[in-house]
Amino acid sequence: TIALAVILVVLCSTVAILDGIWLGDHNDELGIIPFFRKYDYTSLQVGKYDWFGTGAQVAFTFMSGVIQFQVIIPIALFISMEVVRAGQAYFMVQDNHMFDDKSKARFQCRALNINEDLGQIKYVFSDKTGTLTENKMEFRCASVHGRDFSETDGGGEEDRIAVLVDGVVIRPKTSVKTDPKLTALLKDGTGAMAGRARDLFLALATCNTIVPIVEDTADPAAKLLEYQGESPDEQALVYAAAAYGHTLVERTSGHIVVDVFGTRQRFDVLGLHEFDSDRKRMSVIIGCPDKTVKLFVKGADSSMFGIIDKTLNPDVVQATEKHLHSYSSVGLRTLVIGVRELSQAEFQEWQMAYEKASTALLGRGNLLRSVAANIERNMRLLGASGIEDKLQEGVPEAIEKLRQAGIKVWVLTGDKQETAISIGYSCKLLTRDMTQIVINSNSRESCRKSLDDAISMVNKLRSLSTDSQSRVPLALIIDGNSLVYIFDTDREEKLFEVAIACDVVLCCRVAPLQKAGIVDLIKKRTSDMTLAIGDGANDVSMIQMADVGIGISGQEGRQAVMASDFAMGQFRFLVPLLLVHGHWNYQRMGYMILYNFYRNATFVFVLFWYVLYTGYTLTTAITEWSSVLYSVIYTAVPTVVVAILDKDLSRRTLLKYPQLYGAGQREENYNLRLFIFIMMDSIWQSIAVFFIPYLAYRNSAIDSASLGDLWTLAVVILVNIHLAMDVIRWTWVTHAAIWGSIVATWICVIVIDSIPTLPGFWAIYEVMGTGLFWALLLAVIVVGMIPHFAAKAIKEHFMPNDIQIAREMEKSQDSHDVSHPEVQMSTIDRA
């Protein structure tokens, strides 16, 4: 738009300056021109003109030129773009390849102004849980007082422990695979180990916000117990507790009822500190039937081991840490559970502090966190749990496709490092040939040293790589603590230098605001397009920070969806969204914008040539109605239709060759070089439109209105044929739009010239019946299209880009399919 404004100023300045020169050369003759004549024609007095001098007239001419040539600024383009985006959004929503069969949810387009950005994405920032994984947690193993219990049996429907309530058998709705040794220990065991095991599963049954719901079945004597809650992790842990004989059957704001192997026990809820991303743990204070008060705490190992009293059982702590490493190495999500028995004095002190903090008007959240920190200390380690969260269908293939498309995928997760690395290998984010750069620091100094070492490694590997084939792939793995030190000490530039040199970045144990900080790190320092995708409330800040935000409609509510630009059901839908629709949208929108520049510039240059041959008076032979209708009726509809329906490549080709996505990243369809080319093309075509009829009719008696009608028709036909030459896939709608607009132009010109009160009455009829008129139209089209046709042919045959090569392959494949139909049955190679 800035370039078009410059062209407008140049055109207006040229006309104004030439007008000033003309006025100076004809100063003595201005009296005979009605426009300047102040008095009647009986007295021709030199200098007595109705104007304020040459300077003022030049300024007036410049401003009039702005009004005359303002069509070059495509104001209507913004309306066309919104219509096109709405059409593109419709086809994205209706795409069955992005329909989630499990949730029966279609793709949602919540923002209509960034469709084309989907074709230029360079970085994808993804959450892990619920985004790459199903967020359907299954309890797999437990570490109890330093002993590993991970030998689960088949655990089917019949293995679910049932409880009897008022004569009705109630079974948990979900079964859990159990370890028979752990079950036996809980049922019949004695001693410290059995006590710790029972406390652990009591903690799992009580330290949560789960609500038990009893559902009816076909059998009146049997019912199902469903656990509902915000966190799938909590649901899995409560189902596990039920499978091991500790069934949560009732919860109110004041008490919890747990069935312990057939014995119902009531526990008073004396206090609850809910989970938050800063503490990374939650705790509950319960009053037990034996009148003791216990504090149960569960949370991430990075948070829990700081409050565990390691002097009580150092061997147990060491064994548990070993088990946690083993669990996370196979991709399990881990939690650590602790307990402490509170004295009455400790409880009363906590109760007073809690009541004061909870009723505070200012800083309530910080005060409650402080109260929690004071009570959550000197905990006795009970053990740990391992929960499996399976990958979503098609995630490894999707990440591989994105990598082939030149898109860098960064995973930002709250899981511990070993779990994140294991999932990274499972989803093909990490590969065995990658060199891993691990930054896992517990102090500012060690973090600084790790960053410096990482930069040295990157520079060394760069010097050893002579070409792209010999380049060693790099993966950066960094934890949340290191990010805290980096962001606090303004070492972001070094982190950026390391991160962009890596093919993969894996951030673990990161808080929600750190996720947004990572996205902002790239946005501030590059012009690359970023995309963030997540499913939970902790992903909202990241989604809002990225250029394009995508929400997964999953198990953790709709906060991410509500904050996003687009929403879908599965991570794998990102491939057709970006590689197919993103490519189409960018290609079509880029072409539409340049085409609008071209068609308006062609029309304006015709007006400009006319002004140069009419004494710079800024009159026009083209009627005002045609000037207005040019961008509204004559040429608008074909542009919009092509921008919605045209496809440069098929879906199959775009998915088979992800590298074609790079055209959008390199801005091949919208750049300064193409703008200059279309401006040169518009100048040439305007010369053909103006001068061929002008030279043919200059010695005839034809009036300017008839010539203006010829110019109008010639411009409209020329720009529509130009568009038709660039259409790749024709539909009946495309045919109707392009050829229909030409017919509509003819009808409008005839109707306008048939109204006696309008200028140019009957003008079209004066020339339309002559053979010269039709010959000139043909000549204008042929001469005007020669450069465009030649440039198109030369580019496609001698300088083809990847898109054109793929298009030729499609044509060859289509012709081969026609002669050999059996080829259509072969499997498409998507590797």
Task: Annotate each predicted stretch with a short phrase.
Residues 1-637, 732-748, 752-831:
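Conserved cytosolic headpiece of P-type ATPases
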Residues 702-714:
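Structural signature of hydrophobic alpha-helical transmembrane segments
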Residues 582, 659-671, 697-701, 721-734:
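Alpha-helical transmembrane segments
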Residues 684-697:
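Alpha-helical transmembrane segments and their membrane-interface junctions
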